[in-house]
């Protein structure tokens, strides 16, 4: 497994263009740092892909535990990087403003490691159950497992409703599982176990004990999940409206300020589908002009996020 050599990193250029369209000042700090870290490791890989990818054989049997830290931050090529980090961009904007920067950093770090651990457990279990040792040698890189975990969180905080996947309405609570199958039907080169591990980690946080365990550990470190931006508390009610409330610990009057919902600022006026269409068009153009074409690492960006954005914007405008 070697990173493909390409004359022009079209995916990276497209990613940087999208970041600058959003505006660096509009991206929360932990989200921005996550983007920068993924880009930095792509441009300056610490090890070759084969030495940083995650597998049962290399990580568990040969005790190369550093792969748990390296594998989420390495990507096979610029398109693999683009699809993952473009998804990090909008998920980070939504979740970091809801959870607070310190807690979001804690979530990202925990999910990055735990997704790898669950991936190893899944691969080991399948290899033993099917008596097929090749599963122990299957090696994976990329941030998409963490993205699936974040998608579970996002659906948890915005419950109800349906999303359109391949033309079929799917309840929000099942969307991740349907996307998991759809991605691997159309992009068989992606890691099914890695994405499934992300979903399971997300469910461990929203439905299981993970959040309480993290809160208990965070209490020892002096911060909790209620921490937000200084001087502000995020509010969200069942009708779908949200915003920020100034918080004064000494009893000054509270008032609400609606959080800006102009998502055109974040997407340069393009929906998720339009961004994906442009990316795929650029990918096809690039494929026709280079000898080495990108592998099917395209992360499926479903239209659910754009539908949710429009719904929230409609509530805010009432």
Curated annotation (Swiss-Prot):
Chain ranges passing through the membrane: 22-42, 107-127, 138-154, 180-204
Biased composition (Basic and acidic residues): 302-318
Stretches the record annotates as Disordered: 285-318
Swiss-Prot/TrEMBL catalytic activity: Cleaves type-1 transmembrane domains using a catalytic dyad composed of serine and histidine that are contributed by different transmembrane domains
Gene Ontology MF terms: endopeptidase activity; serine-type endopeptidase activity
VCP/p97-interacting motif (VIM) as annotated region, ranges: 303-318
Record's bilayer topology term: Multi-pass membrane protein
Top-level EC class: hydrolase
UniProt xrefs under InterPro entries: Peptidase_S54_rhomboid_dom, Rhomboid-like_sf
Subcellular localization(s) per the UniProt record: Endoplasmic reticulum membrane; Mitochondrion membrane
Intervals, Cytoplasmic compartment: 1-21, 128-137, 205-318
Active site: 144, 195
Keywords in alphabetical order: Apoptosis, Differentiation, Endoplasmic reticulum, Hydrolase, Membrane, Mitochondrion, Protease, Serine protease, Spermatogenesis, Transmembrane, Transmembrane helix
GO cellular component: endoplasmic reticulum membrane; endoplasmic reticulum quality control compartment; mitochondrial membrane
Residue intervals on the Extracellular side: 43-106, 155-179
Regulation: Inhibited by aprotinin.
Statement: the UniProt record of this protein carries the keyword Cytoplasm: no
Single biological process term from Gene Ontology: apoptotic process
Pfam families (alphabetical): Rhomboid
Region (Ubiquitin-binding domain (UBD)): 271-286
EC number: 3.4.21.105
Protein task: Intramembrane-cleaving serine protease that cleaves single transmembrane or multi-pass membrane proteins in the hydrophobic plane of the membrane, luminal loops and juxtamembrane regions. Involved in regulated intramembrane proteolysis and the subsequent release of functional polypeptides from their membrane anchors. Functional component of endoplasmic reticulum-associated degradation (ERAD) for misfolded membrane proteins. Required for the degradation process of some specific misfolded endoplasmic reticulum (ER) luminal proteins.
Family per record: Belongs to the peptidase S54 family.
Quaternary context: Interacts with BIK and STEAP3. Interacts (via C-terminal domain) with VCP. Interacts with ubiquitin and ubiquitinated proteins.
UniProt protein name: Rhomboid-related protein 4
